[in-house]
């Protein structure tokens, strides 16, 4: 930036993005000073190096905003877990189902686990039946990725959110945020 540019000649671009041609470093610094902006080296490895007349503080701010937005969009999908036993009451089942639906609507994957204890381990078909029932009940909000698999003393399935449901929810939340701003 500015005085740290060492090349004797540079390809100059004005603040609007238009090329001004190849000029000496001193001429480029003088033109940037006349406008009251900074001279920033955009591409140091090209022949001759490309420099641009711009407000460096604004450039750094916009770059940090772009990086922050990219990090926010990159946030991975987390896996939430819902556990229950083979002998679960209807009300408890409904509570677990509602919780799994809320996770799916938030865009998270859900790992549904059934834990076997004692003699329940000798009846895995009951676990498969319960997991199929759970997958059917939740099918409006998510799809079962994997069939039931045995994990030591339990069985589990992974349920992924259906894209259209999460997209609709995100759009509505953005619309609500837009309504609140003046």
Curated annotation (Swiss-Prot):
Keyword annotations of the record: Cytoplasm, Initiation factor, Protein biosynthesis
Gene Ontology cellular component annotations, sorted alphabetically: cytosol; membrane
- Chain segments annotated as transmembrane: none
Domain of life from the UniProt record: Bacteria
Similarity comment text for this entry: Belongs to the IF-3 family.
Subunit structure of this entry? Monomer.
Q: What is this protein called?
A: Translation initiation factor IF-3
Q: Which organism is it from?
A: Tropheryma whipplei (strain Twist)
